[in-house]
């Protein structure tokens, strides 16, 4: 076979994709990752590498970047091929092979395909406040790539979900001052996190303002002020800030995958209990999939990845059984 051929092609190198690759490798098959981001890890790397994750089995807490590091090390003995900075554009059937072409004009073939593309293409949701776009990169942020960026700064966080609440807590030991505003009286974040947030507020370690919204951002070469307002009384407050962290969610798009002929439901790929899509030989796992009872959790993505990988392996090589047996009974990976 040509050098661009592997037994299995995995679209997406986020946590679910990486773990799927591990299991494909455990079954003795070759595999390639195709991902538009410049490095593995998906959103964990691109959006919150220094955010703690608390719901991964066996880890009381783990930095997102450390979880990715472990996944990359886990799959490394199986010699994965990484095609990073390439978006999968088309999927075609050529005889008993699939051909995927990418945004870089490359074509890769495989006997089976696993789609682990996360939420698809994503970009931050802007709230449209005057000065917001003007100061992007000069004090307005939509993600925390490094906590060090906020060292000793007065930070305004805008949002009411898990990211906003988690970062308000996570930056307590870094920022000089934290103010969190949310346009509703109640937060959407996990109950335990909200309880911890309000405790920190009561102790004077950070400020919480509800129901407040961002009216405008002001400054010179960098952000200097943020004007917020109470959305019921319209009362304004001018806050001296060094950084405005807008965590209002992300706009996601399925992108080219929408044209692959897959059965979809609300921009998610429909799968059965084997993680099979509507196209035989194409499987999917992680945040990209939907099925009755689906929850968008990393820990579930790992389970889905194992199911998808083992069924894809058996499809690519019918001599293999779907059940891989126990990993503890096998030789160490790479030996």
UniProtKB/Swiss-Prot annotation:
Binding site for FAD: 35, 43, 48, 88, 122, 287, 328
Keywords of the record: FAD, Flavoprotein, NADP, Oxidoreductase
Pfam families reported in the protein's UniProt record: Pyr_redox_2 (PF07992)
Cofactor: FAD
Catalytic activity: 2 reduced [2Fe-2S]-[ferredoxin] + NADP(+) + H(+) = 2 oxidized [2Fe-2S]-[ferredoxin] + NADPH
Co-factor binding details: Binds 1 FAD per subunit.
The enzyme's E.C. designation: 1.18.1.2
Record GO terms (molecular function): ferredoxin-NADP+ reductase activity; flavin adenine dinucleotide binding; NADP binding
First-level EC class: oxidoreductase
Domain of life: Bacteria
Family statement: Belongs to the ferredoxin--NADP reductase type 2 family.
Record's subunit section: Homodimer.
HAMAP family: FENR2 (MF_01685)
Name of the protein in question: Ferredoxin--NADP reductase
């Amino acid at each position: 076979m040509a050098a661009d051929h592997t037994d299995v092609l995995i679209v997406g190198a986020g946590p679910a994709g990486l773990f799927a690759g591990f299991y494909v490798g455990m079954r003795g098959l070759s595999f390639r990752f195709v991902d538009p981001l410049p490095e593995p890890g998906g959103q964990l790397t691109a959006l919150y590498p220094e955010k703690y994750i608390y719901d991964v089995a066996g880890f009381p807490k783990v930095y997102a970047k450390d979880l990715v590091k472990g996944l990359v090390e886990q799959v490394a003995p199986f010699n994965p091929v990484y095609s990073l900075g390439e978006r999968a554009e088309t999927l075609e059937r050529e005889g008993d092979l699939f051909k995927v072409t990418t945004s870089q004009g490359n074509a890769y073939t495989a006997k089976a395909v696993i789609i682990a593309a996360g939420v698809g293409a994503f970009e931050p949701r802007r709230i449209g406040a005057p000065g917001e776009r003007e100061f992007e990169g000069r004090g307005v942020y939509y993600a925390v790539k490094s906590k060090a960026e906020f060292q000793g700064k007065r930070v305004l966080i805008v949002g009411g979900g898990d990211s906003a609440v988690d970062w308000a807590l996570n930056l307590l030991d870094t920022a000089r001052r934290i103010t969190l505003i949310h346009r509703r009286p109640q937060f959407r974040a996990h109950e335990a996190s909200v309880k911890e947030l309000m405790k920190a507020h009561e102790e004077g370690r950070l400020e919480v303002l509800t129901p407040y919204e961002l009216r405008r951002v002001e400054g010179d070469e960098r952000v200097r002020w943020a004007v917020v307002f109470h959305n019921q009384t319209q009362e304004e407050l001018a806050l001296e800030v060094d950084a405005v962290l807008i965590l209002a969610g992300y706009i996601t798009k399925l992108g080219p995958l929408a044209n692959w002929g897959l059965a979809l439901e609300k921009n998610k790929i429909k799968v059965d209990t084997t993680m099979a899509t509507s196209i035989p030989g194409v499987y999917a796992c992680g945040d990209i999939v939907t099925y009755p009872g689906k929850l968008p959790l990393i820990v579930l993505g790992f389970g889905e990845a194992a199911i998808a990988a083992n069924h894809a392996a058996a499809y690519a090589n019918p001599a293999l059984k779907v059940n891989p047996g126990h990993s503890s009974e096998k030789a160490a990976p790479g030996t």
